């Protein structure tokens, strides 16, 4: 996988290094200086067994209690042995990638024995991969691979330095004559622009689907989804603040329309025809996809929302003027949510409202909660529908 990267600013580097030192300080506090002075027994964590059970281990002799926090599951208490190592073994897990952390005396920590990370602006976790058959769309296979390009730029709309990622499919030629369709794929609240590649494996999913001729070759643009960066705060406003939420969506839309899309269409071989432009996202990104896409049908023909969250349930105000006439402009409106997701009821209300307006759409309920395990499957099911003569 080719990676084109520009170096981040000094401020970003200092911030990252500071975070590493903070984690080391916390880890030392829990491991204990005495424990560090001794040569510890070699540990392995996580350990994936042949029956898909997973054992997690964490050395913290001074901790009074430790739990395993795993994505989409209840916390599991861990047991300490005489060497001060806490461990727990799960039931067999479905093949997938799972975020997890150790909660030691109330403090969430990554697994120091595992280099695989799930980056997040508020809650970074470790990741365990429970491998499955090659037929799973997020499993890396021996197929032609696309490339990921990482861009940095100064946003005049938002007033900060930010980044975006672009996936180009296998065979993409920047000097060729072929023009490609584009999917603008948005992350969720507290994720950053890398979410769909670092955690969602969007590039792997596209590589596999394109190789199987289940998806059209396309570019995917994954940009930072915060029009109001202050919304990602432990102490300030949040998505629960309706005014800040609206500012976030509007500023994001303006940056997308005036900065991101023009840059993509200048730099890459993509079509400017609305019939070859799609937008989709998860959680906050799903709400942004609906807000941006359904209010700009002159720009987007394909719209997807996975577990969308943060949209006002006053849909008439959020989507003014949207009615059955939109059916003539939309090629696909695809709305999905997990049945155990805390947002299922708000998404069902959206589904009912769309029905009441006679707006044609696909409504998908799947097993699962508000997790990446659901969203990887959403993407794998959504992408094959894009840029077809007949979608819905």
What positions do the PLM features span?
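Bacterial N-terminal signal peptides
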Residues: 18-34
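Positively charged, low-complexity intrinsically disordered regions
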Residues: 11-13, 35, 54
């Amino acid at each position: 996988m080719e990676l084109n990267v520009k170096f981040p600013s000094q401020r970003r580097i200092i911030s990252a290094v500071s975070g590493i030192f903070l984690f080391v300080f916390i880890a030392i506090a829990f491991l204990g200086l005495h424990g560090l002075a001794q040569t510890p027994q070699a540990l392995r964590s996580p350990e994936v067994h042949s029956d898909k059970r997973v054992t997690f281990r964490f050395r913290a002799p001074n901790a009074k209690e430790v739990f395993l926090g795993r994505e989409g599951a209840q916390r599991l208490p861990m047991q300490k042995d005489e060497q001060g190592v806490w461990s727990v073994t799960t039931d067999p897990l479905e093949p997938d990638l799972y975020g997890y952390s150790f909660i030691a005396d109330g403090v969430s920590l990554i697994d120091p024995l595992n280099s695989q990370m799930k980056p997040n602006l508020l809650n970074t976790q470790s990741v365990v991969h429970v491998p499955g058959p090659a037929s799973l769309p997020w499993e890396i296979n021996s197929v032609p691979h696309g490339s990921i390009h990482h861009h940095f730029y100064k946003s005049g709309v938002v007033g900060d330095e930010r980044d975006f990622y672009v996936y180009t499919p296998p065979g993409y030629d920047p000097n060729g004559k072929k023009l490609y369709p584009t999917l603008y794929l948005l992350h969720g609240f507290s994720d950053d622009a890398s979410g769909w590649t670092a955690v969602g494996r969007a590039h792997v999913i596209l590589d596999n689907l394109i190789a199987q001729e289940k998806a059209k070759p396309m570019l995917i643009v994954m940009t930072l989804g915060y029009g109001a960066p202050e919304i990602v705060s432990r102490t300030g406003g949040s998505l629960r603040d309706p005014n800040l939420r609206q500012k976030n969506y509007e500023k994001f839309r303006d940056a997308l329309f005036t900065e991101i899309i023009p840059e993509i269409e200048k730099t890459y071989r993509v079509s400017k025809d609305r019939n070859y432009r799609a937008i989709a996202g998860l959680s906050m990104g799903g709400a942004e996809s609906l807000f941006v896409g359904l209010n700009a049908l002159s720009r987007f023909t394909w719209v997807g929302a996975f577990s969308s969250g943060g949209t006002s349930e006053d849909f008439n105000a959020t989507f003014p003027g949207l009615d059955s006439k939109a059916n003539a402009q939309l090629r696909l409106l695809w709305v999905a949510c997990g049945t155990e997701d805390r947002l299922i009821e708000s998404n069902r209300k959206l589904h009912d409202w769309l029905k009441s307006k006679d707006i044609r759409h696909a409504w998908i309920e799947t097993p699962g909660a508000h997790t990446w395990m659901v969203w990887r499957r959403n993407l794998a099911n959504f992408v094959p529908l894009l840029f077809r003569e007949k979608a819905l």
